[in-house]
């Protein structure tokens, strides 16, 4: 039973070493050049970079090794791993801050600085290596100060970003399904079944996880677990009732069970993950005592954690919830007479911005951004002729915001890895996040997520003048 439960809570196996070596050798060469031609490829490369940096940090901390100058960078008691983790993530974080500053204000790929975002991978990797060397020159005392006053607040902000993404995605998913159902085309019945099945499945999964938590983690002496599971169950019921309340739906017709089901299943999973992340000093975590799955679950869970952080980081900057775009007003592409006197690139860029605004409002599908039929003329320089480039006339996301969020992610990883782990949990690999601190982070994060979703549901009823649901979401 422990093995079955540990799989969704933890994630990846003994293939980490071989996969890690292969990724390192190709990251800055062929893969970078082939993927870097599209905005998605670029974001994936940065995510892989973050993942590899996290894995190196984890292995260094587990082995308690320093990459450079161990005689100077380790403490008198032989502690090396803590400072190695902070140095590696400090170096990568500084790289992203430098890129954020350099790329400030870039809104078009015609800007020469845009090339730094989507190419020049060798140069960025060399700069990263230089920053690593520099980070090992800085004394250990600096990282103690930095971790307390920069890494911890940055990690908290990153967690909040992830929660906002989840709530936004819940609304986006439900809205997509409902729009297809209301279109009454040949696929509307499929989308209706998909919406009903998805909602039912997520509520069922929430109930199953709640029962499992009460059975496995809520013994008589486990007051923390009992409280966390009970509060989560109460909040699930509250969000369910709110989402179908007649007054709420009158103010927000798009509110429903679909959004609340996704929030409920995610928050219930977070709570269950918190149970499995706590130490077993009070005999409340049977997964730790399952020796047959212990090392596998540690490796699997650590890799899954890093992948989840990389995904959150990559998705955040391209998400409309963080763009601050005003989505009010009609969309009009204009004609060639209105664009007369403008160059081909300028004309195409104006049209692209109009289509991009329509996509953000939901008036057009995202595929419209990849349709080149709206291009009036090709670039005289041929710079926009690359069919794999989805940023031919404008950036798809805020480059500066993208790198700021990556900086926040590096600091959260540093804190996540270096929070104290009890000695009985230490083996060949240190478990990532097996502390009461991380358990409470997950539990409180679930509560905040419920609060964020509850506000998005209640706010239109409280302040109807500030919400226009024809253009909301």
Swiss-Prot record:
Keywords: Membrane, Transmembrane, Transmembrane helix. Pfam families: Serinc. It comes from the Eukaryota. Residues 1-6, 62-81, 139-144, 218-228, 319-398, 459-473 are cytoplasmic. Residues 30-38, 105-118, 168-194, 247-295, 422-435 are vacuolar. InterPro entries: TDE1/TMS (IPR005016). The chain crosses the membrane at residues 7-29, 39-61, 82-104, 119-138, 145-167, 195-217, 229-246, 296-318, 399-421, 436-458. GO terms for cellular component: endosome; fungal-type vacuole membrane; membrane; membrane raft. It is a multi-pass membrane protein. Its main location: membrane. It is found in: Membrane. Belongs to the TDE1 family. This is Membrane protein TMS1. It comes from Saccharomyces cerevisiae (strain ATCC 204508 / S288c) (Baker's yeast). The lineage of its organism: Eukaryota, Fungi, Dikarya, Ascomycota, Saccharomycotina. The gene is TMS1.
